[in-house]
């Protein structure tokens, strides 16, 4: 059975998640990213052989080391930073590991849980992919050697599926609410408060006195600061 090597790309902790800036301060958003990463790591670390955080931000890399993760410093590129960073990390893995599968996860899916991980371990298809809301990719598992080209960005889910089919891979589309939720808006924070009670992220948001109520308006959830 191949070892699973997980890649988690993180561009920066600073000035991140700007769509949350009207609701959370910059330091609060930085700490949010940290606790979300802790949630992902805590749910996969017993099931994978290695976790590699790739970034060019020394702050991110140092925090990853603090969590006892391996790091890969992102190389300089003129464009398409995320996809080039992932390609470089995969190349690094191919030179330093034998008999491996690659799993790529974003750092902002704190509802990813051990049941999701066990699904990956049970199925081990050539290519497992989970869509995000809006057509992105929130999990990519590659269990066969081929010249994989990362296609993250707008509507990447459909591009990744087509690329896998073009390479004659058996594609398993793993549709999971918990994997689909990447955190970008206050409403997403509300979903964490509803569905993520056993997570570091839930505890962090609760300590910020953030509350959630059902809403019958444009947004399904009303998310608010209790002290305001």
UniProtKB/Swiss-Prot annotation:
Catalytic activity: (2S)-2-phospholactate + GTP + H(+) = (2S)-lactyl-2-diphospho-5'-guanosine + diphosphate
Pfam families for this protein: CofC
Function: Guanylyltransferase that catalyzes the activation of (2S)-2-phospholactate (2-PL) as (2S)-lactyl-2-diphospho-5'-guanosine, via the condensation of 2-PL with GTP. It is involved in the biosynthesis of coenzyme F420, a hydride carrier cofactor.
EC number: 2.7.7.68
Pathway(s) annotated for this protein in UniProt: Cofactor biosynthesis; coenzyme F420 biosynthesis
Keyword Heme included in the entry's annotation: no
Record GO biological process: F420-0 metabolic process
InterPro entries xrefs: CofC, Nucleotide-diphossugar_trans
Organism, scientific name: Methanosphaera stadtmanae (strain ATCC 43021 / DSM 3091 / JCM 11832 / MCB-3)
GO molecular function terms noted in the UniProt entry: GTP binding; phospholactate guanylyltransferase activity
Subunit and partners: Homodimer.
Protein keywords: GTP-binding, Nucleotide-binding, Nucleotidyltransferase, Transferase
Family the entry assigns: Belongs to the CofC family.
Protein name in UniProt: 2-phospho-L-lactate guanylyltransferase
